[in-house]
Amino acid sequence: MPGTEQAVSQVRRRAGRPAHAVLSSAHITEAALRLVAKDGYKALTMSRLAKSLNVAPSALYNHVQSKQEVLLLIEDLLMGGVDVSGFETLPWAEAVRQWGHSYRDVFSAHLPLIPVIALLPVTNAPQTIKMYEAVTQGFLQAGWPQERIIDAVVALESFIYGSAYDVNAPDDIFSVGTMAEQSPSFSAAVARRGNTDGRNDSDSAFSLGLAAMITGLAATLPQAPHSKTL
């Protein structure tokens, strides 16, 4: 009977499908990122990661060899979201400004990973290396001596990572409470900040600091044929 045969065929197809989505590096990376976001970096173990994916730990090792490799996948996922397009089309200062804001925004959403990513080698992380390659090419085109580029990038990254924390600082971080009389200059400066209510303004602080760094870095350059792009 055609109807019976079709029903049997559908049952067989359903029975042959895995009970869970097929595991992949992308699934592992996303699950690891969720785990860190929820419980912190120390919660990221291969056993907990496997449990969150509802698979045996041995299944993970078909895709990743270690926790270090999982971290590289996370690093690549995050760095792949940093906008480096400006280095192809914008003057150097504007490109660095755009890159810096994008970089800070990506990592301000993943604070527990900053201490890890900041110390993680980029070895075998293609998206991370792609990001650094675009930045390096932008610096070269602006006339930067090759031997000074990485130092400049590291200096910028140090500021960017710290500023990512400030995005998450409480609005009243500079409230002096009942000690206004003991800190008249500081209290007045807080009150006169861009926000009339004295709230923490991470964007204003970051823009000010990044502009100062860009100006300062540009000032260290020797005169070069492409310095007009600064």
Model regions: which residues?
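Short hydrophobic clusters on alpha-helical segments that form packing/core surfaces
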Residues: 28-36, 74, 78, 103, ...
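C-terminal all-alpha effector/ligand-binding and dimerization domain
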Residues: 203-230
